[in-house]
Amino acid sequence: MFGKLLTKIFGSRNDRTLKTLGKIVTKINALEADFEKFSDEELKAKTAEFKQRLESGQTLDDVMPEAFAVVREASKRVFEMRHFDVQLLGGMVLDSNRIAEMRTGEGKTLTATLPAYLNALTGKGVHVITVNDYLARRDAENNRPLFEFLGMTVGVNIAGMGQAEKKMAYASDITYGTNNEFGFDYLRDNMAFSPNERVQRPLHYALIDEVDSILIDEARTPLIISGAAEDSSELYIKINTLIPHLIRQDKEDTEEEIGDGDYSIDEKAKQVHMTERGQEKVEVLLTERGMLAEGDSLYSAANISLLHHVNAALRAHTLFEKDVDYIVQDNEVIIVDEHTGRTMPGRRWSEGLHQAVEAKEGVHIQNENQTLASITFQNFFRQYEKLAGMTGTADTEAFEFQHIYGLDTVVIPTNRPMVRKDHADLVYLTAEEKYDAIIKDIIDCRDRGQPVLVGTVSIEQSELLHSMLKKAKIPHEVLNAKFHEREAEIVAQAGRSGAVTIATNMAGRGTDIVLGGNWNMEIDALENPTAEQKAKIKADWQVRHDEVVAAGGLHILGTERHESRRIDNQLRGRSGRQGDAGSSRFYLSMEDSLMRIFASERVSSMMKKLGMEKGEAIEHPWVSRAIENAQRKVEARNFDIRKQLLEFDDVANDQRQVVYAQRNELMDAESIQDTIVNIQADVVNGLIDQYIPPQSVEELWDIAGLETRLEQEYALRMPVQEWLDKEDDLHEETLRERIVEIWVKAYKAKEEMVGAQVLRQFEKAVMLQTLDGLWKEHLAAMDHLRQGIHLRGYAQKNPKQEYKRESFELFQQMLESLKHDVISILSKVQVQAQSDVEEMEERRRQEEAKVRRDYQHAEAEALVGAEEAQALAATQPVVREGEKVGRNDPCPCGSGRKYKQCHGKLS
């Protein structure tokens, strides 16, 4: 209450921000009359003047009012469009590392031209990031005339472009592209072998369109570049035949009784768990098929791979539904984005899940992949010096934007007042009653000439409605993952009188629905249209527009509430653009997944007690509140998963930054001879210390072991024992000096034989290739570590701390291996001439050609149990089974080493 009183007196934080920025808008407006008098040449010359002022020490804030006024004037001349004051506000918010929430139809694309131009003046490049290739190309082509008028270059960065094209795109002042492509290019640049293979400049300013979709919905999806691993398609096919034999458990296990069934499903967590009975049944089935030895357990260390395949197949059959989570097209399983309803060709689920789904559907099973490089969008975008974004719906996620990215959200007022009517939800008992009511509403709107946009949450729903409308003989268009080739055309005409459009998750479609239809697209369809033709098309459109407004504008009809309130708001936001008339209503049933999983049974029983007859609906604020609370629960849980994924990825990110920085340093260096000399000294001394411990007596020296290692790993034959037998004055230090001296001489001889330049090139190639190979193995080790780390909670340990500690140990081991492997290769390999180095490079290129890009879904299942396990760590007492192992006793693992030098190290 006190907070509300303060807000009344001082205004909200948002109001205060807008008030401050409003003063700058007044300054920009004051400049308009002066700039209108400028000739085109004088206006264009302002770009060079701004650049000069920045070089002489002024800041972007100093030139911003004039720069925005210049862009507004140029837009009036090039597009015949003037930036509204609210668009100037949006531009300022985007320039100040914040997120601008601008309603649909308020001109986000035009708003983006202001900060894009301003930040391009620095010469460091601006990346305007959209959700798909179509929007990137469209926005680049639409805005190119304006930017080129002002002397700026524009590039487009989309999938399938060659290296030279990408370099040119990144060298442009303003580069449009998709989030995937910018992320992949970053990873590819960090896998390059020479500086001229890199395409990106340092990451300066990113302006993200549909920022909530990219920074929140896709935050659980790391970008992964991977290479094919071994073929295990036969195994997936065999395991797939087991699943139909398993039965789902009807009720959960309790302390009193064990539920019947082989597996249980946790729909909230999207997890499936095998019961003890299920495990026994799977073991019997595997034994019958000769895949498991008689009496062997599925959970033994040797059968971990089998268990992994069984779990993947079980998830594929129980949690992933055709035409909801994926579609089958051209003998291929293609993922459907749950947030936008778009298909995502080229993306694959990780951890063998995609192959399991392919086996389930009987299509060609593609090989599993090995990760070569990966990064989450969260960590990629946090590398930009400046980051900003715009969307129609950000306020519900404002906390996450601030907490994860440090970005404040500012809600920009609409240019004209919003007049859309948002009706209360109608809740029915069954889905059948709900769909009947939806069809009646559609018919009613169509009879009045009101266009209807029906939003569904899955392809399955859209196809059900499609068949019902077909049966009712109602003409309509369907827009879903199966038919998005005609997307722009369908959306453009969705505002015509009586039009009925079914759309799966309308979010991110990128084309505004104009009441009466899109007259611009009609003009674009004509070749060289005359002024008369344009005038006629516009006049006809005006008549249609007025008819639709009189009928009530665009009516939004939601068939189900989405897990996220934001997606519902995006659907609603398609209506009522720029002060247009419009309305919206959601139809729900107690059989909807959100209601079934999260809304309490009390709602359902209350509806039954009310004695509701078939076809009756309940419309009550209490029910709407219950639904909103259910959505809040899901949003909070999803936020926790994203936050947890980020906490784990931050550990990997620190290591990634070190490796990539070191890699770029090596690649840019003319010669890495000094680095090789230092590594060589470390390796030699480490090796000698291992076999001749410092300040130790001769009896502890393992000379035979030292001679063997020197010969096997470093191709150096040294009769160390012979020297010691013959030379009495040879002690530890003089022996060390002699070994180092011979080693250095052998390497010098190699250099004299092939030439210093060839050896320097070879050193660099070996160093980079060895680093890449070890980094690849390290990523796989980190994946395995992360997948099982939550189990540490059951051993009273904090999974996050354990992950940090063990991943650091793995990283240290990788760096040690790098030193030894590089020196071993350089010592053993005989380089004959330049052709050997070139052959090595050619082999690398051939390997690289086999590498495919994968945009894999890592839904963080491995982390879901971490918090639960962590809680257990705090509450469960320590119970030791068996005798305590002494520090000097042999390790129980059977390695032959002392416990303190083996597994005792970790305890």
From Swiss-Prot:
Its EC number is 7.4.2.8. One of its GO terms (molecular function) is metal ion binding. Keywords: ATP-binding, Cell inner membrane, Cell membrane, Cytoplasm, Membrane, Metal-binding, Nucleotide-binding, Protein transport, Translocase, Translocation, Transport, Zinc. One of its GO terms (biological process) is protein import. One of its GO terms (cellular component) is plasma membrane. Its cofactor is Zn(2+). It comes from the Bacteria. It catalyses: ATP + H2O + cellular proteinSide 1 = ADP + phosphate + cellular proteinSide 2. May bind 1 zinc ion per subunit. Zn(2+) binds at residues 891, 893, 902-903. It is found in: Cell inner membrane; Cytoplasm. ATP binds at residues 87, 105-109, 512. It is an enzyme of class 7 (translocase). InterPro entries: Helicase_ATP-bd, Helicase_C-like, P-loop_NTPase, SEC_C_motif, SecA, SecA_CS, SecA_DEAD, SecA_motor_DEAD. Gene3D superfamilies: Helical scaffold and wing domains of SecA (1.10.3060.10), P-loop containing nucleotide triphosphate hydrolases (3.40.50.300), SecA, preprotein cross-linking domain (3.90.1440.10). It holds the Pfam family P-loop_SecA. The keyword ATP-binding applies. It is a peripheral membrane protein. NCBIfam families: PRK12904.1, secA. Part of the Sec protein translocase complex. Interacts with the SecYEG preprotein conducting channel. Has a central role in coupling the hydrolysis of ATP to the transfer of proteins into and across the cell membrane, serving both as a receptor for the preprotein-SecB complex and as an ATP-driven molecular motor driving the stepwise translocation of polypeptide chains across the membrane. PANTHER family: CHLOROPLAST PROTEIN-TRANSPORTING ATPASE, SECA INNER MEMBRANE COMPONENT OF SEC PROTEIN SECRETION SYSTEM. Belongs to the SecA family. Monomer and homodimer. Part of the essential Sec protein translocation apparatus which comprises SecA, SecYEG and auxiliary proteins SecDF-YajC and YidC. This is Protein translocase subunit SecA. It comes from Shewanella loihica (strain ATCC BAA-1088 / PV-4). The gene is secA.
